[in-house]
Regions:
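Conserved N-terminal beta1-alpha1 strand-loop-helix module at the mouth
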Residues: 1-109, 114-120, 127-130, 161-190, ...
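Conserved functional loop/turn residues at catalytic and ligand-binding sites
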Residues: 89, 139, 216, 241
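Alpha-helical hinge/cap motifs
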Residues: 123-124, 139
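Glycine-rich phosphate-binding active-site loops on the catalytic face of alpha/beta enzymes
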Residues: 134-154, 193-201, 242-261
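A short, conserved beta-to-alpha structural element at the edge of catalytic cores
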Residues: 150-159, 178
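C-terminal active-site rim and adjoining tail of enzyme catalytic domains
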Residues: 226-228, 238, 247
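Acidic, divalent-metal-coordinating active-site segment for phosphoryl/phosphodiester hydrolysis
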Residues: 233
Length: 273
């Protein structure tokens, strides 16, 4: 299973970072880093009845597809992509920082946050405490916790650590058992992600969000992830009570990113001019 491979590799990758010196360096950098923007608050403020808030993803590659665009082998202009998202009405950003499987970088996150005035999610496989300090030091406003990747107590501890650092937390689920675990163990969680991608087959099904959304109590922000490619999908999610959607692949691979955002949001070019 691809997730198991990624997690095993991630733990090995992080071993050399487990030093007091590096942690001290990150804590010092945090002191000089502006406080996080409100990721959840922004999603709540920018969603509408007919359109969930858009979390637009800066993504170079994936394990299943490789590079999302051929020209990325020569140049990946992550700053220009993030600025385009901002210009055309995205509510927030998601920035892939995993190096070996998604060809991301923490430096992408840092530079984007220095140039684009939007809240950003550090899209990473969080398996060690040091990663939360990295996320905060590099400018993240929110982090991702993947329930399938964590033990129960680890999920609780990581959530508390992130909140203690001032970060919002998107807790990602894939099925009913994971959702029930989150609602039981993290009763004050605000952001619940539902990933429509099957981690074994990598196929997507929006029915996963529709099924799980009905089980989530009021007061939570529901974020649908993966498999969102057209306006009809967005309408379907809005009708299911989804508050935000995380979209990467269909934006990155579009001939015109701005036009694709307008299509998904159901707005005219004049409305974003």
């Amino acid at each position: 299973m691809i997730l198991s491979r990624i997690l095993e590799h991630k733990k090995a990758e992080l071993r050399h970072k487990q030093s007091r010196g590096y942690l001290s360096e990150l804590k010092a950098r945090i002191q000089d880093t502006p406080g996080p923007l409100g990721f959840a608050v922004t999603l709540e403020a920018t969603r509408t009845a007919g359109c969930p808030a858009l979390i637009a993803e800066v993504k170079k590659a994936s394990p299943s597809l490789g590079l999302l665009r051929p020209e990325f082998s020569e140049r990946f202009d992550y700053l220009e992509i993030a600025k385009t998202y901002h210009t055309h009405g995205a509510s927030a950003l998601s920035v892939l920082t995993d190096k070996d499987f998604f060809q991301g970088s923490l430096d992408y996150l840092r530079e984007i946050k220095q140039s684009v005035p939007m809240p950003a999610l550090n899209k990473e496989f969080m398996v060690e405490e040091i990663q939360f300090y990295e996320a905060r030091a590099y400018g993240a406003d929110a982090v991702l916790l993947i329930v399938a990747a964590l033990e129960r107590q680890q999920m609780i501890d990581f959530y508390a650590l992130a909140k203690g650092l001032g970060l919002d937390v998107l807790v990602e689920t894939h099925h009913e058992r994971e959702l029930d675990r989150v609602l039981e163990r993290l009763p004050d969680v605000r952001l619940i992600g539902i990933n429509n991608r099957d981690l074994k087959t990598f196929t997507t099904d929006l029915g996963v969000t529709i099924r799980l959304a009905s089980r989530i109590p009021a007061g939570k922000l529901i974020v649908s992830e993966s498999g969102i490619h057209q306006r009809a999908h967005v309408v379907q999610l809005a009708e299911a009570g989804v508050h935000a959607m995380l979209v990467g692949e269909s934006l990155i691979r579009a001939d015109d990113i701005g036009e694709k955002i307008r299509e998904l949001r159901g707005v005219s070019a004049q409305a974003t001019a």
